[in-house]
């Protein structure tokens, strides 16, 4: 579950039905990690306090039901804080809520020939409210960061255009940076064939060759050297790009042995 997406579902209803006003919002920590936490400071009329408290409880039950068996530790809470000194202008607040609600998150397209493999996706990764100097004035800036990936460059550009439209309609400035080019795998590669044979000779079993949906340096190298054959391999990593990320130590030694064997084979 994306904590930012869940939070904005609650915010949209609180603003629409209970006259809530948004003061600030924070969520996510890394662009390549699905946000696990998000929070917002809102103001509400005194007579809406019980209604908003009930709203939060209802949404927590709803989210637990929607993600049953997937997000067992999901929590949604509300607590009183000091009254904020200022609120986000109402029109900006409304545009922001609509844009984040509309912004795609998750799988956008799968590989047609391999429908269990993701081709194109977007991660609505971070949102923050920051005070910055603009033309010698302190202003509050709301920043939203996404990470779009695809093994097909044109599909990535299509999805980026969708995201740009959503936030441009909300009056936001949209920029793109740090793009990873797509890397389309070549399962008929001679390099892959050689290293599969090497692995079998080294360990007496067949390697598991899979396509993964991730940003790899191979995409950047392949853009500059389109005829270069490449594969990516390494030790077993569990829960990547999360606070629970860890490596299987036993596979590091195996990985090292395979690197030596691969260099000899080449």
Locate predicted features:
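His/Asp/Glu-rich mid-to-C-terminal helical/loop segments that flank catalytic regions of hydrolases
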Residues: 1-17, 46-49, 94-101, 109, ...
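Midchain, well-structured core segments that form catalytic/ion-binding scaffolds
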Residues: 1-148
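Short glycine/threonine-rich loop-to-helix capping motif typified by GTGT followed
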Residues: 31-39, 87, 91, 184-197, ...
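Zn-dependent metallopeptidase/amidohydrolase metal-coordination segment
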Residues: 112, 119-138, 147, 198-263
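Short, flexible active-site loops
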Residues: 140-150, 174-181
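C-terminal, non-catalytic macromolecule-binding modules
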Residues: 145-169
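Short, contiguous acidic/charged loop-to-helix segments that flank catalytic cores in large enzymes
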Residues: 149-154, 182-186, 246-247
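Generic long, charged, amphipathic alpha-helical segments
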Residues: 167-202
């Amino acid at each position: 579950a994306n904590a930012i997406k869940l939070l904005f579902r609650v915010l949209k209803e609180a603003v629409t039905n209970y006259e809530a006003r948004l003061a600030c919002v924070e969520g996510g920590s890394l662009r390549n990690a699905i946000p696990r936490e998000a929070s917002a400071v809102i103001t509400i009329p005194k007579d809406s306090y019980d209604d908003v408290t009930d709203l939060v409880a209802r949404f927590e039950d709803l989210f637990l039901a929607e993600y049953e068996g997937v997000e067992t530790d999901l929590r949604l809470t509300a607590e009183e804080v000091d009254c904020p000194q200022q609120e986000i202008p109402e029109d900006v607040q409304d545009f922001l809520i609509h844009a984040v609600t509309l912004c795609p998150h998750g799988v956008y397209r799968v590989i047609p020939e391999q429908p269990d493999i993701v081709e194109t996706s977007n991660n609505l990764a971070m949102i923050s409210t920051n005070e910055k100097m603009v033309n010698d004035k302190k202003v509050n800036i709301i920043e939203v960061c996404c990470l779009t990936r695809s093994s097909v460059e044109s599909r990535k550009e299509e999805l980026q255009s969708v995201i740009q439209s959503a936030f441009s309609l909300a009056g936001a400035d949209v920029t793109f940076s740090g793009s990873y080019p797509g890397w389309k795998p070549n399962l008929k590669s001679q390099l892959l064939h050689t290293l599969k044979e090497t692995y079998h000779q080294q360990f007496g079993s067949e390697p598991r060759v899979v396509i993964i949906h991730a940003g790899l340096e191979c995409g950047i190298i392949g853009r500059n050297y389109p005829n270069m054959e490449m594969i990516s391999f390494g030790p077993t990593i569990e829960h990547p790009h999360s606070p629970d990320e860890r490596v299987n130590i036993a596979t590091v030694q195996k990985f090292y042995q395979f690197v030596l064997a691969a260099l000899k084979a080449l």
